[in-house]
Amino acid sequence: MRKLLNTLFVTSEDAYLSLDGENVVVNREKQVVAQYPLHILSGVISFSYAGASPALMGACAERNILLAFCTPRGKFLARTCGESQGNVLLRRTQYRSADDPLQSCRIARNFILGKVYNSRQSLERTLRDHKHRINEESMKAASESLKESLHMIAQETDMESLRGFEGSAAKIYFQVFDDMILNQKEAFFFHERSRRPPLNRINALLSFAYSLLENDCASSLEAVGLDSYVGFLHRDRPGRESLALDLMEEMRPCFADRFVLTIVNNRVIKEDDFEVRESGAVYLKDDARKVFLQQWQKKKQEVLTHPYLNEKISWGLVPYVQALLLARYLRGDLEEYPPFFWR
């Protein structure tokens, strides 16, 4: 269990939540393992299949305390709401902000700042750890270009210009992505991004990682009461979870991309773990997909210090914390949305 931003995260998949007076009680194997007063909580997010008592659900709904349920892997299932839906005000604010060019730009700018900063951090980490195995000159040049981009992005107030900076920064970053592939280089190479369908092994891995990360971000947004389909950076499109795509931008380089590089460089995934279809599309075989998912879950359990909260949390909770911070900003509790700056 972790209490962050006055939100209780219940990460034990066999934990059952109940009510005792004015306290939420966490039970495991019919034993009480923790209690928290309801008045100090603004939300409870449970990653357990065991569920919660109707009494606790009613108490949370009555007090406008978020109570959300996700699978142990992070997929959003449901949340409780009372007679008056507290999320209505949050969503109305979200929709107004999405329709306001200046407000949209302000939020989108911080998503992009996080993405470009973390892209540069990934390059800097490779330079630090493997400078004798890479083209040091080109990596340093790319890092310096991204550093310059950060200054320009921070001052930009036009959405189309922001999107242009984001696209240029992504191009710089991916131009040296191949240099970060240290092993199995004959079988695993990048060259350029291909999405639908992925046309080589690295793109197949990136596409799979991005789809999992998008799922996690969508679940976190829904869990805190935001509409995952209405974004600020990505335009509305039927069936597209634009806000989930917004939120995942800052986590792509430091989580998804680094994860793919790790499983390739450590030879967890190998050349013959893929199938090539008649269309030229490249996909992971079923057994390799299982290995990928197992490693993904292990990665989500790794602990880091959150740069804004300065508290240790698991990688798997990062999307939920960022979604909470975004909701707090929209409610007016924070002066601006704090991007996730990877250290």
Predicted feature residues:
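Active-site helix-to-loop segments that bind/position phosphate- or nucleotide-bearing substrates
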Residues: 1-19, 29, 35, 87-229, ...
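Catalytic micro-motifs at enzyme active sites that drive phosphoryl/nucleotidyl and oxygen chemistry
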Residues: 14, 33-34, 49, 55-57
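Acidic/polar N-terminal loop/beta-strand segments that form early-domain functional surfaces
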Residues: 20, 29, 46-49, 70-72
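Hydrophobic residues embedded in beta-strands of well-ordered beta-sheets
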Residues: 24-25
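Extracellular/luminal Protease-associated
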Residues: 39-52
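Short alpha-helical basic/polar micro-motif
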Residues: 42, 54, 58, 211
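Phosphate- and other anionic-substrate recognition elements at nucleic-acid/protein interfaces
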Residues: 52-54, 58-111, 120
